[in-house]
Amino acid sequence: MTLRVLVVTAVAAEAEAVADGLTGCATRSARRLPSGHTVTSHVLTAGPATRAPATRPTAQAPTAAQALTGRAPAVPAPTAAQAAGPGAGDDPSADAPATADPTATGDATVTAPVTAGGPATVALEATATVDVLAGGVGPAAAAVATATALARAPYPYDLVVSAGIGGGFAPHAPLGALVVADAVVAADLGADTPDGYLTVEKLGFGRSVHTPPPALTARVADALRATGGPCLTAPVLTVSTVTGTAARAAGLAARHPRAGAEAMEGFGVAEAAAAYGVPVVEIRAVSNTVGPRDRAAWRIGAALDALRGAFGSLSSTVFREE
């Protein structure tokens, strides 16, 4: 069964780093959303597939998403052809809707290089479809883009990933480090009072924290640590205004002493994913230190390289697990 992942970044440079990092990509395509965003779809393959004869479905082994998030595998209902008995399912297109997505069968067809004997076509088993979307800067733009992608997708997603670069909290997250969120926190969604900051929970207006499935967070972090660079699991703060002073950095660190990184989109992505019942994880590559704004000290190129490496690791491990 193909794992389907939606990766949401803020800007095109981040989306390109994610796409460039994906390994084993057999086909790429693009589709336009009504919101004006473009989703690029990458089908990752493992090798030549052998299609088994149709049989009545039985309990399936857990998919990667189920294994990582603790979801129980389901017993699929038989198709009309399977219910009709032997011979009825000989035509593989009999039960497929006319507009079915090519990746829905779990197979992708690619054309092999031309040889002396002419071009050959080989069927490759699709292990994952990774859709990448640059949704815009800030939690509102990210939420709109993610919700639109989820609503208009030709297939249901198993996982949503908020990914990009961000600021790191010293000394936990040095430049170039990867941070995997064990909590996605809307750090400025609340109210300032003479007695201090109040979260929306304390105000009675909703939530400011999303907690990714712990098993998923741990598996992603393990895969990223295999890249050899620094990687930590910690809360990632979502803010609408990037921190640019020592005083604000100190205030955030005091309220969130375990914080690893600051970015602007994670909570918006998580809100949209939660509305559709899809698990979410956030990954940030550190480009600068949270604190006084000093563009000369930023290392955006190195952070994008780390992001590229992160998705190289994920596309060869977590996205391919059975």
Label each PLM-derived region with a short phrase.
Residues 1-52, 56, 117-211:
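Metabolite-binding pocket within alpha/beta catalytic cores that recognizes anionic/polar moieties
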Residues 21, 25, 215-230, 272, ...:
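Generic non-transmembrane alpha-helical segments
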Residues 40, 45, 49-59, 63-64, ...:
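Threonine-centered tandem repeat motifs in low-complexity domains
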Residues 133, 161, 179, 232-237, ...:
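Hydrophobic/aromatic beta-strand patches that form the interior of the parallel beta-sheet core
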Residues 156, 174, 232, 258, ...:
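Short loop/turn motifs at secondary-structure junctions
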Residues 196-257, 268, 276:
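Active-site rim beta-loop-alpha module in soluble metabolic enzymes
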Residues 247, 252-263, 267-301:
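Active-site-adjacent mobile loop/cap segments within catalytic or ligand-binding domains
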Residues 290-322:
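His/Asp/Glu-rich mid-to-C-terminal helical/loop segments that flank catalytic regions of hydrolases
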